[in-house]
Amino acid sequence: AENKKNVLELLDNVWEPATNRAQEEIDEIQNLIQKEGNNFKLKPWDWWYYSEKVRKSKFDYSEEDMRPYLSLENIQKAAFTTAERLFDIKFKAMKKFPKYHEEIKAYKVLDNNNKIVGIFLTDYFARPSKQGGAWMTSYQDQSKNKGIKHPIVINVCNFPKPTKDKPTLLSFEQAITLFHEFGHGLHGLLSNVTYPSLSGTSVPRDYVEFPSQMMENWIRSPKVLKEFALHYETGKKIPQDLLKKYEKCQKFNQGFATTEYLAASYLDLAWHSNNRKIIDINKFEQKLFKSLKKPNEIDSRYGSTYFNHIFSGGYSSSYYSYMWSEVLDSSAFEVFEKKGLFHKLSLIHISEPTRLRR
């Protein structure tokens, strides 16, 4: 992005359309609240409950409708198959590998000549002592300096464990999370550099979310869902009418989602442009959001005291990079939409800036 001016230009260009759309969504929810005989004003903590009611009434669709078709096993298979088709690699389960918990699974990643590419680990399930959220970590970065080192990376999530009666069934948002973190994992696994300091996700922040957000497109694709979204009991493919409902509401709640994200991006920049040593956090946030004319019904995705990304998570003054990468991802994925979902030559559009092997 080069400078703050360019970042603000991107955020400002999106802010007004996003908040305009968010206001329409607010009005829809407020109308529903009143229609149900209530007279209170919508608050941020009411949003998800009532927005789901609006979605159900407008599209006859709920994310819970998808869950029986999104078993963890099948969604992971979808991710692996997508990578295999795009990058000519394969994932082989390993029975023995040092690990810090018994739930971790290890996979040897091989190229089409059966040569080792790296090791991919998964730690998918929630447990009492585990940090919340989802992320990718590299235990060994790929490099060629002083001998070849193959990458060892892990995807960590907090999905519910299977029960005696049911496998782990994901919400669609959780399926997207799996693909997102898998994109980060591929960024580390397919790195092709000499020096470890440039390996994997060690790219400019403008690009670091590019491979992860790019991967999300495949799980959103009806073609992939038709192949891998299978009912956990019957094995039947996801019904066409359910897919159509899903496609119709793809942009539902986008005003809200974009507004809360942008508010957090502005907050990040405000903190890292501030020179004062002592500050009242609440007043600082209130002043910023008032200047932006942020709708009171929508909170920032993260408040200052819970904004791990920008204070200890490596995104200091660069939380904007999610949107920056989204712009890149949108342009790059257009090529796949035109030439085919698994068109290998289209990979040139994502390989160069992210230093991936081709």
Where are these regions (language model features)?
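Active-site-proximal, well-structured secondary-structure segments within enzyme catalytic domains
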Residues: A1-N158, N217-Y266, A270, I281-F284, ...
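Pan-zinc metallopeptidase signature
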Residues: M66, L72-I75, L243-F336, K344-L347
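Divalent metal-coordination and catalytic microenvironments
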Residues: A83, F182, S212, L267, ...
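Acidic/polar loop patches that form or flank catalytic/metal-binding clefts of enzymes
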Residues: D88-M94, H187, V193-L198, P222-F228, ...
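Short pre-active-site segment immediately N-terminal to the catalytic Zn-binding motif
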Residues: P160-L178
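Post-HEXXH active-site segment of zinc metalloproteases
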Residues: P167-L170, G188-M214
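Active-site recognition of the HExxH zinc-binding catalytic motif
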Residues: E173-G188, S212
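Single conserved hydrophobic/aromatic residue that forms the stacking wall/gate
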Residues: I348-R358
